[in-house]
Amino acid sequence: MDARLLEILVCPICKGPLHYDRAAQELICNADKLAYPVRDGIPVMLVDEARQTVEGTPVDPSGR
């Protein structure tokens, strides 16, 4: 994921920051507990495509 792109992308719901999970190929919004898929290097920022992250499991913001 291009670092410059990640700097400008925000959660479409809360407009908060996203964290890239390289292993899962997802952009994570910790505030809304949603994960947006990254397909073929392209972030899919549609709410209907997002999945709920596991409640109580913090996502590592470093993407590790």
From Swiss-Prot:
Listed transmembrane segments = none
Q: Name one Pfam family in it.
A: Trm112p
Q: Which domain of life is it from?
A: Bacteria
GO CC aspect terms? cytosol
Q: Which family does it belong to?
A: Belongs to the UPF0434 family.
Q: Which PANTHER family match?
A: PROTEIN PREY, MITOCHONDRIAL (PTHR33505:SF4), ZGC:162634 (PTHR33505)
The name on file for this protein is UPF0434 protein Bmul_0750/BMULJ_02510
Instruction: Name its species.
Output: Burkholderia multivorans (strain ATCC 17616 / 249)
